Swiss-Prot record:
GO terms for molecular function: manganese ion binding; RNA binding; RNA-DNA hybrid ribonuclease activity. This is Ribonuclease HII. HAMAP family: RNase_HII_B (MF_00052_B). It comes from Geobacter metallireducens (strain ATCC 53774 / DSM 7210 / GS-15). Its EC number is 3.1.26.4. Belongs to the RNase HII family. A divalent metal cation binds at residues 33-34, 125. Residues 27-213 form the RNase H type-2 domain.
């Protein structure tokens, strides 16, 4: 078994990276992605997905390009056909304690650890590797070029959105159900008026200015 070479892979499809890795002897390839690095409130959620080779998932793409109903539909398809799905969560307190990058990597590692099928290779969206002793490849915009990463992006996004809908019930007035914690004008105005709530990220600009000394 040798590590795959990604330098010249020619014309690409959403299965290109998975197929290349499989041809090099790896058979449990997990795509890993996150949702929620940028918001001012709530957790960062990561997902890891292992798909059966050649699985047909029409419509799967970067979750940010899909409508909420489309994501929910695809979430069901992915959950039904995947060999394994894992989810990891780093909450607001963890983010404030160790910073958003380290919290994201921790959530990703947790997601991989939750997989019922142990992966032998990881495809990761972005530029940062996960602190796990597994062969892995980071892919910029991987959620638009890898079927496994795209699937993980959908699982992570839907999972986090559902959490933020619940937080909207616990902490009314901030509009979490609408903006999911992102720093839009209405959210910033709510923070200025009401002050931060328990799930706000106290180290983030837009929130820290309103934290009592």
């Amino acid at each position: 078994m040798r590590l795959p070479l990604f330098d010249d892979i020619g014309e690409r499809s959403l299965w290109t990276f998975e197929n290349l890795v499989s041809r090099n002897g790896f058979h449990a390839v997990a795509g890993v992605d996150e949702a929620g690095r940028g918001p001012l409130a709530g957790p960062v959620v990561a997902a890891a997905v292992i798909l059966p080779q050649g699985a047909e998932l029409p419509g799967v793409d970067d979750s940010k390009k899909l409508s909420a109903p489309k994501r929910e539909h695809l979430f069901g398809l992915i959950s039904g056909c995947a060999l394994a799905v894992g989810v990891g969560v780093a909450d607001h307190a963890c983010i404030d304690r160790i910073n958003i990058l380290q919290a994201t990597l921790r959530a990703m590692a947790e997601a991989v650890g939750q997989l019922a099928v142990p992966p032998d290779y990881l495809l990761i969206d972005g530029i940062s590797t996960i602190p796990l002793n597994l062969p892995q490849k980071t892919i910029k915009k991987g959620d638009s070029s890898s079927i496994s990463i795209a699937s993980a992006s959908i699982v992570a996004k839907v999972t986090r959105d559902r959490m933020m809908m619940e937080y909207d019930q616990q902490f009314p007035g901030y509009g979490f159900a609408e903006h999911k914690g992102y720093g839009c004008a209405s959210h910033l105005a709510a923070i200025a008026e009401l002050g931060p709530c328990p799930i706000h990220r106290k180290t983030f600009r837009g929130v820290k200015e309103h934290v009592a000394p």
